[in-house]
Amino acid sequence: MKEDFKKFKEFIYKKRVGVVGIGVSNIPLINFLIKLGAEVTAFDKKTEEELGEVSSDFKNKGVNLELGDNYLDKLTGFDVVFKTPSMRIDSECLVKVKKEGAYVTSEMEEFVRYCKAKIYGITGSDGKTTTTTIISKILQEEGYKTWVGGNIGTPLFAQIEEIKAEDRVVLELSSFQLMTMNLPMDIAVCTNLAPNHLDMHKDMQEYIDAKKNIFLYQGSTNTLVVNRENEITYGFEAEAKGEVREFSSKREVKEGAYYKDGILYLSGKEVCKKDNIVIKGMHNVENYLAAFIATKDDVSIENMKKVAESFNGVEHRCELVREINGVKYYNDSIASSPNRTLAGLKAFDKKVILIAGGYDKHLLFEPLANEGYPYIKELILLGQTKEKIKDVFKDLEASKGIKINISEVSTLEEAVKKAQDLAKQGDIITLSPACASFDMFPNFMIRGNKFKEIVNEL
């Protein structure tokens, strides 16, 4: 039984509340807390000038601002602290304020605690956003008012009083958001797990443990959806407290969702043919299977099929940007891990000219070389990791005699120009970096948009 939001309203009134981070999700949160009568102090590394109108607006509303390099020095003396998702709970300033007696939480935790609607929580290393979007589209097609939040969509806590019990909520949840989550999801979906974000987590085990929080607090009436073909998520079944549902791209799963001989099935019934799905690639087949088995109690097979045969995909995910002189340019900027890039490469029916490299998340690139080489015609490298990636392809050449031509460049503009020079009619060029963007761009979306801008100016 979900808690009554009146309880939070009574609790937060007149409380001294610190909000760490004045970003996209926390601006609506801060405004909501003001509306509920809290005394808010907002903390951010940005300066007043960088925040612009946001800072003047908050000051006019009576919000105290602690900004600049040492912005967390004054995180003390609060009743409640809302942290940003990327802020570790064991960071020195949060440990200190917790010892003082502060209640430390996040926008997402409070939303899950008080949301009356059925919640679908989706996590995984790859496919989270696409699966989240597919689930939301399927629910909308069935006629549900559907709210999308977490890593995508809009911050939902500020809208919690508008969300009705008969609505549906779909949340994309990262390992950072889940690290402190101790609340049940009605339906928890784990698309797959592979090494990722090892620059932020102590090790792979901590990353897995964070992801497990999506289902560890469930009860007997809740549901966990796992990928039968992913060793780590399949292993979660032993710890599940509610119903477990499986999906598989490689075997028949009697009561689950599976792919066989070009057809996607749900509980033994055909939903759609693979060739009729608009977004290509086996990774998208898996995303659909996860969505079908997750929503089977809420949605008809007819509406599942309708979405699969009409949904064009999410921006920055194997997105066709343009065709010039018979050469197709794809933006797969979301691919911030080798596994994700491999999935993208396998979506094409021919070898591609691959643009890769970026910020170093301390991931291993051997799989990209050992499994990816049959799909790569030319490799163009840039960014912090270009030498690391080059080394694994050179090792492949030394050990197996398999040579991939490698070009090194300094900028995305140079990469696109080099790809254009190398391409012949009928070729495919894809930006699928296998790395995060932070060495050159603030996020993968800005990287993808820059790529599209460069391609559209050719």
UniProtKB/Swiss-Prot annotation:
The terms describing its cellular component in GO are: cytoplasm
Query: Which UniProt keywords are present, listed alphabetically?
Result: ATP-binding, Cell cycle, Cell division, Cell shape, Cell wall biogenesis/degradation, Cytoplasm, Ligase, Nucleotide-binding, Peptidoglycan synthesis
Q: Which InterPro entries match?
A: Mur-like_cat_sf, Mur_ligase_C, Mur_ligase_C_dom_sf, Mur_ligase_cen, MurD
Its UniProt entry gives the catalysed reaction(s) as: UDP-N-acetyl-alpha-D-muramoyl-L-alanine + D-glutamate + ATP = UDP-N-acetyl-alpha-D-muramoyl-L-alanyl-D-glutamate + ADP + phosphate + H(+)
Question: What are the GO MF terms of this UniProt record?
Answer: ATP binding; UDP-N-acetylmuramoylalanine-D-glutamate ligase activity
- Name the residues that bind ATP: 124-130
Question: EC number(s) per UniProt?
Answer: 6.3.2.9
Where is this gene product found? Cytoplasm
Q: Which family does it belong to?
A: Belongs to the MurCDEF family.
NCBIfam families linked to this entry: murD
- Give the protein's recorded name: UDP-N-acetylmuramoylalanine--D-glutamate ligase
What is the native source organism of this protein?
Clostridium botulinum (strain Alaska E43 / Type E3)
Q: Which gene encodes it?
A: murD
